[in-house]
C-alpha cells in the first residue's frame, strides 16, 4: 500500500541501501517483533515458566540471528521511548510495530530506558562472545520483569 511504502521510505531515512533492506527483511523482522511481543507479555505477567520456554526457543536460533534480534529489540525500545513524545516524525515504526507500541510505550520511560538498553547491549556482547544463549536470554528476560514493572515499595 502507499502508506506502507511511505513508512518504509521514512524508516530508510534517505538511504538507498536501507530502503532495499526494508524490502527484504520482512519475514525476519515480523518474527523478531512476535518474539519481542511474546517476551514483553510474559514479563508483564511474570510467567517465569513461559519466559524460560521463550529463552529455550531463542537458543535454537543461530548466533547471527540472535544478535540481529537483540539489535532489533534495542531499536524497538528506542522507538517506544520516542513514541511517548507524540512526535510521529521522530518514529521509525512499521505499522505492526506501531500497533504494539500504542499500548507498550508507556512501560518504557526515562526511569528504565537506559537500564533496558544496557541489558540488551550486554546480552548482545555475551552472545557475540559465545556465552550459553539459553542463560543469556533467560537472564535478560528475568531482568526485564524488574525494569518494566519495578517492585512496589
Regions found by a protein language model. Name each.
Residues 1-72, 76, 80-153:
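Charged, glycine-rich active-site and insertion segments that engage polyanionic ligands
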